[in-house]
Amino acid sequence: MQRQLDRLHRQLKLTQAQEAAWAQFADTTLGNVRQIDDLYKDRAQHFEAMSAIDNVKNYQTIIQREAEGLGRRAVALQALYDALSPEQKQAADRFFRYQEERREQRYMARHSG
């Protein structure tokens, strides 16, 4: 995720005045990633001992935390996006569109056939 953030930061060519909004967005994004990574690591450590219901409830917790994190990320992204110039907004739109296309391609490669 850090590489993606670094790439987006370079593409946006932010001004000094925009850096605070960027820092909030990047910190929120990385905090969310760390939280979910920790939850999956904990899940892996306890997976063998989980009952079927524990498994589903644990996964539900992870998905809920992902959704909460996505909400925080959306708020931080909105603040950043509002500070961008029209050209920077276009760059951000392209970046996120490209990321989503890649995610869809990976999903389809795993689930087709």
Task: List PLM regions with ranges.
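Charge-rich (acidic/polar
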Residues: 1-113
